[in-house]
Each structure stands twice: as structure tokens, then as C-alpha cells.
């Protein structure tokens, strides 16, 4: 929790999946801090309040932890304390899926699966102590003031925050929560994967109709959780500006383009078990809707927002350099296997947490209130962008035809043709221009860029999507008059001959078919 900085197998899988990929932890006693904090007067934003005493049970724990930190149990003034960072939330940030777990959190009576390699322990933010109090399976009720414990030996997460805030000087509070509330992301994933194993058909038709309602239901719960964390910090004597409160969204662990991986191992060996169309639905619909909900909660509550929804694009399960763990069955813990045997599946792996840590480090240094993070050039190194992806992607409309540049069939695999189509606002018609790399990314995935195949800069060459690489044949310049030209062949322009023609290179002639807005 706290650390100083540094055939039969198939049937077993199916049976285990049917139980759950992510197990909702049992709810035990109610936080003993409820009366002390839930009704406490809240200081005005930007002003520190007097420190409110903890209830005896929590004060005892605080004193014990202080003695370990400093050699005595005294509560010190802020300026005399060690600095710290803390993460709260669920399996996405606890370290579930990494494979290395802190003692006491890897079963059999506690499955929080906190990893010493989780993101909060690996940032470049200068801090003396890092706390990871997130727990796999947590919902907002396990985090909020007066909430419920997940396990008998766990505190409500806001109580852990209250203790850390009094013993150290917190610089950043990170919250990743919402997936286990109305959304029930784990059970949905369980169902989708199980249906694939049992040949029962895709899960998209089952969940699409009610998905937005699920998102709408979780938004006020996440927003209320942010408010509670603010209250806990004010009760500990912090002004709102004394620390950074960050809400991070969830990346998609799966995608439909796995066969583009030249070393694709197959779905079962690679762990990307599920219908390809369901993977596309998850990436293109389910996760983006969830992200918008988390963003709304962060914005409405005044938290700093980090959009990580596109962070794993190009690094999904079964892709090269994957940042997420695929379907994984631990046959030895527990034994005999049960629902907990597969709970590590479809979560960030150690590389994924390294990516989170990099994004958080950049966000803290940038001082932004809202930013997005992704590996836009397939370098393996995440980069922070001072934009919200929701606002960055826009349709590209042709001046002559009025049609929009469109990835054919809403596909995103390598070689997908690009042309004109009736403007419809879908993600296969959203585009973002990366100023640094001069690349045009399609909204479907951060990892597919407009590409001149084989770098053949010639009249009539058709444009396609391809894995973003930063290569010269994926670099374009936007010239006066709305033309778009290959950086390596600026006498040629992107051209739409008719409303639904393929997008081609043609000699620049100033015609409306070569102008885009």
C-alpha cells in the first residue's frame, strides 16, 4: 500500500470465464470516519481549513504509520513532512494484470492485487513516498466518505487518503474509477469473451442499446467521489491549490486489427479472445462513450483530467509491444480455479503502467487542467498533448463535392482505402493533424495514419490507412487555399474527383476538388 520511491483446458477457461473476469469485492463494514468527515464543514475553495481530528480507529493507524516514516507518531506541519503521491480507484490503477502483487493482496481473502510496479510508484514526479490504495473490483462506494470496505483488512479508500494527507505532504491525488459502477465493465467483458468461446454470437447487439444509460448513471457517482476527495483533503488542512487532483480515463485493452501484427500469435495463444466485431465495438463505441462520461465528471467537479482512452492504441492485446494482458488463467492461485483465476485478464501489464506513469509525469510538469496522452508515432513512448481528443478530431470536407474524407467501411486495418462519402459524423470520418509529425490520424484509432502506399508519389495514386510510423510517406503539409500535399512531393495534392471517389494524388491545379476544410 505504501512504499518508499524506487479440450480440458478450454473447458476450464470457459467455466472460469462464466463466473467473472473481474470479481466485485464483498462489502464489509462502514467507514469509521463517516461521522467525522461526512458532516464536516467544507472550507471555501482555495483556502485551507484547520485540520479536523480523525476518529480514534484511524488516528491509531495514522500514528503507527507516522512512527514508521519519522520514528515517532507526531503529526507534523505540512512544511516538515515527506512529500507523497497517492492513487485511488479500481483494478485499472491498482496493478491488476501486472503479475507482481504486494503481500496480502493476492488472495485468498483479499484480491486487491496492488502491484509494486503500478504507475504511482513509477512516475518521475519527485516524491519521498508513494501510496497505492486502489483495489481491484472497487466501485465508487468503496472510495467515498462513509463508504464500505471491500475486505475486512481494508480501509475505505478515502480513509486511507485522510491518513496519508496528515502524515505526508501530498502533491498529487490520482483517481481512476467508474468501471465497476453502472457500467459493469468486467461482467460485460466476461460475457463477450464467453460468448466467443461458446460460439453464441456477438455481444454488441445485447449491450449497445443501454450503454449510454450506463455511462450516464456512473457520471454523478464519479463526480461525487471527486467532491469527497476534496473534502477529505480540506479536512486535512489542504487548500485546493496545494496539490493536484487528477482523474484519468481508461484505455481500451482490445482492438479489431490484430492480424496487422506480423507476429500475430492467434487469438487463444495471444489472449485476444473475442469476436473481432465486438473488439471494434469496444474500441470505437464502448470506451469512447465511457471516456466522455469520465471527462464530464472531471470537468464538472473541477479536477484535472487526463484522457488515456487512446493510450493503448497500437499496443492492445495481440498487437506488437502490447501494453495490456490478454486472457490469462492462473491455475495455481487459487486452487482449484475459480472466478479469481482470470481476474488479471484484460488489464494493463507492466509496460502499460509504465505508460501511465510517463503520462502522469508529463501532466504534472505541464501544469495543464486537461490533456490527452498517446503513442501517436508508434515510438513506444507516450506523449502528452494539450488537447482533449474529443475536441481534436474533426471531419475533413471537400469544397467541390461537399462529401467528407472517409475510411472505407469504418475499417482501420492496414490497407483500408480512403475516399469520399456522405458526411455522417462517424469516427471513420474524424481526422486529427499531428503538427509535430505532420501526420493525419483517423479517429478510429490513434495508430492508423493516412499513407501514400510504397511512397509512390505519382498521378492517380490512391491513399490508404497504415500503421502510423512517422515515415515520409505519412507526412503531409497543409498549404494555402485548403490543399493538402505530401511533404515529399508538394506538386501533388489530395484530390476527390467525385463525391464518393477514392482519395488520390493529382497534380495541384487549384480546383475545388483539391480544397478541404
Pin down the residues of each PLM region.
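Structural recognition of the beta-strand scaffold that forms the well-ordered cores
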Residues: 84-96, 129-134, 171-176, 181-183, ...
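Extracellular glycan-recognition/adhesion modules and their associated mucin-like linkers
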Residues: 384-412, 430-457, 473-500, 515-517
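Secretory targeting and sorting signals
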Residues: 1-44
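Histidine-centered active-site loop/cap adjacent to the catalytic His
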Residues: 330-378
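Short, well-structured alpha-helical segments in soluble
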Residues: 146-168
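Low-complexity, acidic Ser/Thr/Pro-rich repeat tracts that form intrinsically disordered stalk/linker regions
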Residues: 31-79, 83
Amino acid at each position: 500500500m505504501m512504499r518508499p520511491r524506487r479440450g480440458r483446458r478450454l473447458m476450464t477457461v470457459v467455466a472460469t470465464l462464466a463466473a467473472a473476469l473481474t470479481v466485485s469485492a464483498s462489502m464489509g463494514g462502514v467507514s469509521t470516519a463517516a461521522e467525522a468527515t461526512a458532516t464536516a464543514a467544507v472550507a471555501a475553495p482555495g483556502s485551507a481549513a484547520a485540520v479536523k481530528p480523525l476518529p480514534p480507529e484511524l488516528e491509531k493507524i495514522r500514528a503507527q504509520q507516522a512512527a514508521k516514516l519519522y520514528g515517532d507518531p507526531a503529526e507534523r506541519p505540512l512544511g516538515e513532512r515527506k512529500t507523497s503521491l497517492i492513487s485511488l480507484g479500481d483494478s485499472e490503477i491498482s496493478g491488476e494484470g501486472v503479475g507482481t502483487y504486494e503481500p496480502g493482496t493476492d488472495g485468498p481473502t483479499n484480491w486487491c492485487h496492488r502491484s509494486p510496479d503500478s504507475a504511482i510508484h513509477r512516475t518521475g514526479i519527485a516524491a519521498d513516498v508513494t501510496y497505492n490504495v486502489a483495489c481491484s473490483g472497487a466501485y465508487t462506494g468503496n472510495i467515498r466518505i462513509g463508504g464500505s470496505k471491500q475486505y475486512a483488512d481494508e480501509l475505505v479508500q478515502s480513509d486511507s487518503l485522510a491518513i496519508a494527507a496528515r502524515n505526508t505532504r501530498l502533491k498529487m491525488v490520482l483517481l481512476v474509477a467508474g468501471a465497476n459502477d453502472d457500467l459493469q465493465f468486467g461482467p460485460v467483458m466476461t460475457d463477450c469473451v464467453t460468448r466467443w468461446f461458446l460460439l453464441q454470437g456477438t455481444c454488441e447487439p445485447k449491450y449497445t442499446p443501454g450503454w449510454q444509460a450506463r455511462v450516464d448513471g456512473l457520471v454523478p457517482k464519479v463526480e461525487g467521489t471527486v467532491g469527497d476527495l476534496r473534502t477529505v483533503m480540506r479536512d486535512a488542512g489542504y487548500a485546493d491549490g496545494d496539490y493536484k487532483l487528477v482523474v484519468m480515463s481508461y484505455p481500451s485493452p482490445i482492438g479489431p486489427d490484430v492480424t496487422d501484427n506480423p507476429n500475430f500469435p492467434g487469438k487463444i495463444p495471444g489472449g485476444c479472445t473475442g469476436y473481432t466485431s465486438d473488439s471494434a465495438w469496444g474500441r470505437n463505441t464502448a470506451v469512447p462513450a465511457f471516456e466522455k462520461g469520465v471527462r464530464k465528471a472531471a470537468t464538472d467537479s473541477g479536477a484535472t483530467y487526463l484522457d488515456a482512452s487512446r493510450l493503448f492504441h497500437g499496443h492492445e492485446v495481440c498487437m506488437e509491444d502490447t501494453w495490456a494482458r490478454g486472457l490469462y488463467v492462473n491455475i495455481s492461485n487459487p486452487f482449484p480455479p475459480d472466478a479469481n483465476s482470470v481476474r488479471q485478464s484484460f488489464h494493463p501489464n507492466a509496460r502499460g503502467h509504465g505508460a501511465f506513469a510517463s503520462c502522469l509525469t508529463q501532466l504534472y510538469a505541464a501544469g495543464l487542467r486537461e490533456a490527452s496522452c498517446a503513442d501517436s508515432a508508434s515510438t513506444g513512448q507516450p506523449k502528452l498533448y494539450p488537447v482533449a481528443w474529443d475536441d481534436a478530431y474533426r471531419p475533413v470536407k471537400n469544397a467541390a463535392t461537399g462529401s467528407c474524407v472517409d475510411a472505407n467501411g469504418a475499417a482501420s486495418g492496414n490497407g483500408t482505402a480512403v475516399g469520399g462519402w456522405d458526411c455522417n459524423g462517424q469516427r471513420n470520418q474524424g481526422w486529427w493533424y499531428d503538427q509535430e509529425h505532420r501526420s493525419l490520424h483517423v479517429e478510429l484509432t490513434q495508430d492508423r495514419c493516412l499513407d501514400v502506399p510504397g511512397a509512390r508519389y505519382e498521378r492517380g495514386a490512391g491513399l490508404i490507412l497504415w500503421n502510423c510510423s512517422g515515415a515520409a510517406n505519412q507526412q503531409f503539409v497543409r498549404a494555402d487555399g485548403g490543399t493538402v500535399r505530401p511533404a515529399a512531393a508538394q506538386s501533388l495534392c489530395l484530390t476527390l474527383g467525385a463525391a464518393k471517389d477514392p482519395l488520390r494524388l493529382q497534380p495541384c491545379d487549384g480546383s475545388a476538388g483539391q480544397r478541404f476544410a
